[in-house]
């Protein structure tokens, strides 16, 4: 469902949709499939797109382990500046994630810096 999110880039992200979630907060379940879909306008020409997912736990941002980082597996690369991108990322929630509430920052990074960035609240069960 549609998530409320904070843009942490330059306003590129127009929509964020996460399986079985909506509103301010998302509860995700370890070992279960998860689909995150983000719509944004590409702010640069890039040959690559690297996925970075950070969870802020006790005030410290830590990289979420066990996730695919090659964004070109989910969106056609190279990307041209101005292209409308529909980025659909499907994964299984890593079983090693601790059961905590956290603010998550998801970034897609291109050759020239951040392509898109969104923050949202989530809890792992």
From Swiss-Prot:
Protein's GO biological process: sterol transport
Domain of life assignment: Eukaryota
Pfam families with a match to the protein in the record: E1_DerP2_DerF2
Cross-referenced SMART domains: ML
Protein keywords: Allergen, Secreted
GO molecular function terms attached to this record: sterol binding
Principal subcellular localisation of the protein: secreted
CDD domains: Der-p2_like
Record GO cellular component, one term: extracellular region
Subcellular location, record wording: Secreted
InterPro entries: Ig_E-set, ML_dom, NPC2-like
Family named by the database record: Belongs to the NPC2 family.
Name this polypeptide is given: Mite group 2 allergen Gly d 2.02
Organism: Glycyphagus domesticus
Source species taxonomy: Eukaryota, Metazoa, Ecdysozoa, Arthropoda, Chelicerata
